[in-house]
């Protein structure tokens, strides 16, 4: 069954590394309305990502959640500040198992229907403990989400390696993304626990996956968490999976921040230009240098993200 076209999709950013209350609205980016007392309960930015995806299909609206940020409370807090209703959320998708995308899963579940289990779609590798080792000796621990805690919280765990269709075939989750080019080589100093206490180098992060929606008369809207598979690999795979060449919008992390990834920014942006998306919204781990280069080379497509922005495509 192919991916069905939807009439409209909205992507609402609940968690990102940046919040800027002064950004203007654009053709597709609708910034949150600020109440008079906005400073008493401000939107929170952090090193993490979460976005709600709402599609209109067959005269009905359907809402799903991609990722849940780092802090246990941030996504839920921002949803409250935005008065954003998650009680009708039908599905949660985990882009991968890193804590900055899975840290809020337990608390955000309380905002959803508690009378039924909510499917949580993810790759089995998402349950591996991870870490990042820097050349200067520093390490960052990336503890895995707890399958038992998630089940107790009311999720139905659904582990998928390959692509899967959801919401009346209107949302496609990519599953594992093939690495087909010669410059997006993964995360070389990333490690995964293969047995208790035993870490092995894991540059590919195979659990990385993205969400694809095909908007009628426009093309693909592709939402990533971190884009560890490489944003160009991800976009090309989306085209291959759907048979649709038009890319209308790209929203999410591109993992181009830091010294390991900055050398491929120029090549990545060049390839992104060739793919000709109408809108590019780099988030989270994309990094200032990559965002600046996208803005310079693709000024009509680039949109600066901020927590609370609602994109309507």
Indicate residue ranges for each PLM-predicted region.
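Active-site-proximal beta-strand elements of phosphoester/diester hydrolases
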Residues: 10-14, 64-67, 171-177, 220-226
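Short acidic, glycine/serine/threonine-rich loops at helix termini
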Residues: 24-25, 131-135, 262, 294
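N-terminal amphipathic/basic leader segments beginning at the initiator methionine
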Residues: 1-31, 164-174
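Active-site metal-binding motif and surrounding structural segment of the metallo-beta-lactamase
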Residues: 73-121, 242-249
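Cap/insert and terminal regions of metallo-dependent hydrolase folds
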Residues: 98-102, 119, 199-307
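Conserved beta-strand hairpin/beta-sheet module of binuclear metal-dependent hydrolase folds
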Residues: 17-20, 25-82, 204, 208-224
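Metallo-beta-lactamase
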Residues: 125-209, 273, 303-312
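Short, acidic Gly/Pro/Ser/Thr-rich loop/turn segments
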Residues: 18-21, 73, 127-129, 179-183, ...
């Amino acid at each position: 069954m192919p991916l069905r076209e939807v009439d409209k999709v909205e992507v609402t950013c609940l968690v990102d590394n940046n919040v800027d209350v002064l950004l203007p609205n654009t053709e597709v980016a609708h910034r949150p309305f600020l109440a008079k007392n906005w400073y008493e309960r401000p939107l929170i930015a952090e090193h993490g990502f979460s976005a709600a995806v709402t599609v209109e299909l067959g005269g009905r609206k359907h809402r799903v959640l991609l990722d849940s940020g780092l802090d246990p409370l941030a996504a839920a807090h921002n949803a409250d500040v935005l008065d954003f209703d998650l009680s009708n959320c039908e599905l949660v998708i985990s882009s991968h198992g890193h804590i900055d995308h899975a840290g809020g899963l337990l608390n955000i579940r309380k905002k959803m229907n508690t009378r039924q289990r909510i499917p949580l779609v993810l790759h089995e590798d998402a349950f591996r403990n991870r870490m990042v080792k820097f050349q200067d000796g520093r390490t960052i621990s990336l503890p895995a989400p707890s399958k038992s805690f998630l089940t107790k919280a009311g999720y139905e765990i659904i582990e998928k390696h390959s692509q899967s269709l959801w919401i009346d075939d209107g949302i496609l989750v990519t599953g594992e993304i093939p690495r087909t080019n010669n410059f997006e080589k993964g995360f070389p100093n990333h490690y995964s626990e293969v047995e208790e206490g035993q870490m092995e180098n894991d540059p590919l992060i195979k659990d990385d996956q993205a969400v694809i929606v095909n908007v009628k008369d426009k093309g693909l809207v592709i939402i990533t968490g971190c884009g560890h598979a490489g944003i160009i690999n991800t976009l090309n795979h989306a085209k291959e999976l759907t048979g649709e060449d038009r890319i209308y919008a790209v929203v999410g992390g591109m993992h181009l921040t830091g010294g390991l990834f900055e050398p491929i920014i120029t090549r990545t942006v060049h390839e992104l230009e060739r793919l000709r998306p109408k809108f590019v919204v780099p988030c989270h781990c994309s990094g200032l240098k990559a965002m600046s280069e996208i803005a310079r080379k693709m000024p009509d497509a680039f949109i600066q993200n901020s927590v609370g922005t609602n994109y309507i495509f």
